[in-house]
Amino acid sequence: MLDVAVAYSRYQFLGEEFLTWLWFVIEKNQNFIKSFDPDFVALEVGNRVVLENRKKDAAERITIKGDGASLEEGILALKKGSLITELNIVYKSAELRWQFTLKGESLNISTLSIPSTGSAESEEDIEGVVLEKIFLYDKALQLIEKLYAHFTKLRVSDTWHSSESPLIRKWIQSS
């Protein structure tokens, strides 16, 4: 049986490849996301991207943050072999908007901001407000779970090497 720490470090590349693939999907192919959420409007790179290049003797870390920050430095880092370790995502569905950061090494979600809900005007309304908040949290989590499940199936298929990986490389080189 694998030690948890060994397994964690051995497979963290999957989460980082997932985030890199997700950025590619955000830039080039958002239409297929509608199959996971019929009300899907958009998925955008938010206000923070962290990339890391571990191919040299020392790890190089690049952080791009701020509203309206240019992502060209991130593309340049991808060209040099970096992988995304954190990605802030803006998810829009119907008239609703979520924003959160996804960490590659563990796929932890942090700073999840959900759409605002109605306030409870009486004690009877509290249960409805709580259930609405649970639904809104779950909707963002379900999207990430479905995207990751799709990614893992794609990653172990022949399509990854024959089609998807070359498309990602082409996107990185042409940006």
Name each model feature, range by range.
Residues M1-S175:
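Intrinsically disordered, low-complexity, charge-rich terminal extensions
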